[in-house]
From Swiss-Prot:
One of its GO terms (molecular function) is rRNA binding. InterPro entries: Ribosomal_uL4, Ribosomal_uL4-like, Ribosomal_uL4_dom_sf. Residues 49-78 are annotated as: Disordered. Pfam families: Ribosomal_L4 (PF00573). The keyword rRNA-binding applies. Part of the 50S ribosomal subunit. This is Large ribosomal subunit protein uL4. The lineage of its organism: Bacteria, Bacillati, Bacillota, Bacilli, Lactobacillales. Keywords: Ribonucleoprotein, Ribosomal protein, RNA-binding, rRNA-binding. GO terms for biological process: translation. Gene3D superfamilies: 3.40.1370.10. Signal peptide: none annotated.
């Protein structure tokens, strides 16, 4: 079992927290992490691209000239693809780029990125993040007290709304809960700031 130092929100040591090796101490599987990140990035694509095919463009219902006798090539519509202003052939249509991976793969990727952060000493555990009201300045003081000045993902327990509201407006700070933190967010962050309650929830879900 791995031990990490537990801090309070003033930056003082408040003891040790024992992490479950089944979640935070595995050998990271880089290929699985890669696959999940590609999947999550694909899901972020809007997919709203669209063009008009010959049935969608305006006009072109009448045959421009008779079939025979003019000496010109036969045409059925001025909105055929070979005409200027005609419909596009096989153009992009709105669609979702997202696809799902098996749950076991997604869970292995989560455990891999968590384990990597712990191994690299980029995992900061805090006993609680308690605020009586949303105060961005107060959360900035917490980060300063914990010597966190780089891109950080704050992982909270469910229902800690004041902490989430206090953190969300700070630059380089992203907020998630124990159940919504994604592999992409964790991998993109320089450090993780995780509450003790969130650690328990992560272990409950992934162990």
């Amino acid at each position: 079992m791995a031990n990490v130092t537990l801090f309070d929100q003033t930056g003082k040591e408040a003891g040790q927290v024992v992490l479950n090796d089944a979640v935070f101490g595995i050998e990271p599987n880089e290929s699985v992490v890669f696959d999940v990140i590609i999947s999550q990035r694909a899901s972020l694509r809007q997919g709203t691209h669209a063009v008009k095919n010959r049935s969608a463009v305006s006009g072109g219902g009448r045959k421009p000239w008779r079939q025979k006798g003019t000496g010109r090539a036969r045409q059925g519509s001025i909105r055929s693809p070979q005409w200027r202003g005609g419909g596009v052939v096989f153009g992009p249509t709105p669609r979702s780029y997202g696809y799902k991976l098996p749950q076991k793969v997604r869970r292995l990727a989560l455990k891999s990125v968590y384990s990597e952060k712990v191994a690299e000493n980029k995992f900061v555990a805090v006993d609680a993040l308690s605020f009586t009201a949303p105060k961005t300045a107060e959360f900035a003081k917490v980060l300063a007290a914990l010597s966190i000045d780089s891109k950080v993902l704050v992982i909270l327990e469910e229902g800690n709304e004041f902490a989430a509201l206090s953190a969300r407006n700070l630059p380089n700070v992203k907020v998630a809960t124990a159940t919504t933190a994604s592999v992409l967010d964790i991998a993109n962050s320089d450090k993780l700031l995780v509450t003790q309650a969130a650690i328990s929830k992560i272990e409950e879900v992934l162990a």
